[in-house]
């Protein structure tokens, strides 16, 4: 038997209903903030991610699903490992920043070659949010406030903890990088193997090492905050002031750096202690240089207009839906959602009348989910009704047609009664979704 690939999971109907419920709440909050939905390709040119994410990141070095297509000459392509790079590519390609400050969101599968474990899969799903055009700290605070409202709507507000840091500007970060490398070079024999590798490729990622011995070495290491300029400090302080005004609690985590090279200034994560090692549910930050960086790359490759490139500020976040659903199962379980409210059973001799009744009910009561079985025996149809999860079963035979009535069976109590054919058309008589 052919099975799903390791780390790629089917989402079956019972679970899919919970996904739709979660996605509808998140989409509702995004709409309340005026964000617009964009649909992006799941395959992009490999070079896009190498330029945007950074060639020395774990994602680009060892986690991407890449292949070469059949074009002439062949083009290296990659299943998207994250969404921001594609969103920036789309904004640049379609000139969405011309006279506007787009606020966009997208949802869909991402792909990374990682060791599958609970809450982390090779195909996983994210909702991503990107706000373009404002360099001011209120844009950072708005995104964080939005996620705070999402947690409240999902019943998760008390289970989330917000961690903040500032990465400053690129020159400030480079100065800090040199100081950190100098400090750790003398102690590299005490570093874990992964951190030794990162010392020469991406030393800031050592800060979020999970190894206790490495964290002990970092206690006396130079602090990034000491390398920030006045403007970066003022920006970060204003973000904190806005969050305080909004009543959103936070912690400063000086080791929070994020795994992607494009971030600057504010970075943040929402974490929980309910999911073990998979503690981060949502993460994001500011990336003011990425729009211009990708435009500049196009100019170098002869794909742009060769005009001087001015970058545009941007800030965004992404949250993993698998982890969010896991957290909800632990602290705020979503009730099972039956696929059917009313099941219509019709005697084979009057089955066409049953089809007409069910169709009329679907037109008249769009709030109800109405199912029918095929034109088999009444006994076989009732077995299907029992398994459907329906609250009511409507039974139609010749007697009901002659009397212009329906028989209604309460599937929970087993009680059965006769009612007028239009009884279910009145919401006051039955509504499962109050």
UniProtKB/Swiss-Prot annotation:
Its main location: cytoplasm. One of its GO terms (cellular component) is cytoplasm. It catalyses: tRNA(His) + L-histidine + ATP = L-histidyl-tRNA(His) + AMP + diphosphate + H(+). The keyword Cytoplasm applies. GO terms for biological process: histidyl-tRNA aminoacylation. The keyword Protein biosynthesis applies. It holds the Pfam family HGTP_anticodon. It is an enzyme of class 6 (ligase). GO terms for molecular function: ATP binding; histidine-tRNA ligase activity. Its EC number is 6.1.1.21. CDD domains: HisRS-like_core. Gene3D superfamilies: Anticodon-binding domain, Bira Bifunctional Protein, Domain 2. Keywords: Aminoacyl-tRNA synthetase, ATP-binding, Cytoplasm, Ligase, Nucleotide-binding, Protein biosynthesis. InterPro entries: aa-tRNA-synth_II, aa-tRNA-synth_II/BPL/LPL, Anticodon-bd, Anticodon-bd_dom_sf, His-tRNA-ligase, HisRS-like_core, HisRS/HisZ. It is found in: Cytoplasm. Homodimer. Belongs to the class-II aminoacyl-tRNA synthetase family. This is Histidine--tRNA ligase.
